[in-house]
Amino acid sequence: MTTILKSLPKGENVGIAFSGGLDTSAALLWMKQKGAKVFAYTANLGQPDEADYDAIPRKAMEFGAEKARLVDCRTQLVHEGIAAIQAGAFHVSTGGIAYFNTTPLGRAVTGTMLVSAMKEDGVNIWGDGSTYKGNDIERFYRYGLLTNPALRIYKPWLDQQFIDELGGRAEMSAFMTSHGFAYKMSAEKAYSTDSNLLGATHEAKDLEHLDSGIKIVNPIMGVPFWRDDCAVKAEAVTVRFEEGQPVALNGQTFTDPVAMFYEANAIGGRHGLGMSDQIENRIIEAKSRGIYEAPGMALLHIAYERLVTGIHNEDTIEQYRINGMKLGRLLYQGRWFDSQALMLRETAQRWVARAVTGEVTLELRRGNDYSILNTVSPNLTYAPERLSMEKVEDAPFTPADRIGQLTMRNLDITDTRAKLGLYAKTGLLSSGEGTPIPQLENDKG
């Protein structure tokens, strides 16, 4: 039996992820009038552009919902965001600046917590506003069915009758007005925005064109640092971790991780930290482009990685990065709770994050311009005396030790030279001036 419904299931309980915007408002009213029993669920994800969460369920009831619930998802969202930082679960980057997977993290939390709330109310049909071209339709599908295997999916935007009757925002606005709801369309922006406490995504419309960029975006979590009239003062900030958990900012200890994240966003946002312009591959392998904000995630990530590099050895750091790239892609694909993702995540949290205790002091300037001023940890394996250019007592190794170590390298150098000669003989490589490798003499003995 298919889990996707192509038409409205009249007379049945249907849950809708309700934002209070024009699209979901029109969809709720339309489904009600067509005979469905509509239940509205709103996720409080700490969206920085949402002024009054409590008003959203009231609005849903006015439009005919049988029941409307506001589900506070912020604590779980921050929990997942910190887990992503601990595991370095970020696979999309440009020039070393990462996209912090804030939308995929939000979908993992929304998709599980809203469907759990629906299940409590006896609602086993779920609708949301994701379109067939995007990532969210698959993310919500996976998380919804993981949470409730009896779930069926109904999306008004995949229902041809809904599309024929309310195919655009102008039609939706007219529909709401004709039924006594003076719903005016908001002014059209040059792009669309989706946000949560961890970050904001700006995409589509004008941002689909690569000759439009960050300068057309009005940040909602930070400042337009690229503008000459935007005053940004340098600021020192200290971040403290205990066993991989961020616990203090500028000496202020937080017992509530949500409050800590609000403060991290405020600090990073004052500088525009964490904004990036990325071209990425969607789940369906088509490329899309987005402008991202994540001031708090960026601040914590920078401090965390500084401690990681000062505490762990090279092989551990290498594996952390490899696993993080893989885990980031799984997260992006809506597989954050799949077994392979849990394995990678648990590995990082247990063997990398647990050792990360200490403080990092940064100087934030404009955008992603910052300096690291100090790093302190009881677990640092960085020991400057090991490599000091000055004479030190009880040196860990001597010139004679290094001579012996270099002599041992002759074994693999000889093997490598022989291989290069073999490749040159077979035509795989050319040697000599102007080629990738210099003229090498054959090993004569």
From Swiss-Prot:
Gene Ontology biological process terms from the UniProt entry: argininosuccinate metabolic process; L-arginine biosynthetic process; urea cycle
EC numbers: 6.3.4.5
Enzyme class: ligase
Catalytic activity: L-citrulline + L-aspartate + ATP = 2-(N(omega)-L-arginino)succinate + AMP + diphosphate + H(+)
GO cellular component: cytoplasm
The keyword Nucleotide-binding belongs to this UniProt entry's keyword annotation: yes
Binding site for L-citrulline: 99, 135, 139, 192, 201, 203, 280
Listed GO MF terms: argininosuccinate synthase activity; ATP binding; protein homodimerization activity
Keyword terms, alphabetized: Amino-acid biosynthesis, Arginine biosynthesis, ATP-binding, Cytoplasm, Ligase, Nucleotide-binding
Binding site for L-aspartate: 131, 135-136
Major localization class: cytoplasm
Annotated positions binding ATP: 17-25, 43, 129, 131, 136, 194
Subcellular location: Cytoplasm
Keyword Lipid metabolism: no
CDD domains: ASS
InterPro entries per the UniProt record, alphabetical: Arg_succ_synth_type2_subfam, Arginosuc_syn_C, Arginosuc_syn_N, Arginosuc_synth, Arginosuc_synth_CS, Arginosuc_synth_type_1_subfam, AS_cat/multimer_dom_body, AS_multimer_C_tail
Functional pathway: Amino-acid biosynthesis; L-arginine biosynthesis; L-arginine from L-ornithine and carbamoyl phosphate: step 2/3
Subunit description: Homotetramer.
Family: Belongs to the argininosuccinate synthase family. Type 2 subfamily.
NCBIfam families referenced in this protein's UniProt entry, alphabetically: argG, PRK05370.1
Name of this chain's protein: Argininosuccinate synthase
Native source organism of the sequence: Rhodopseudomonas palustris (strain TIE-1)
Gene: argG
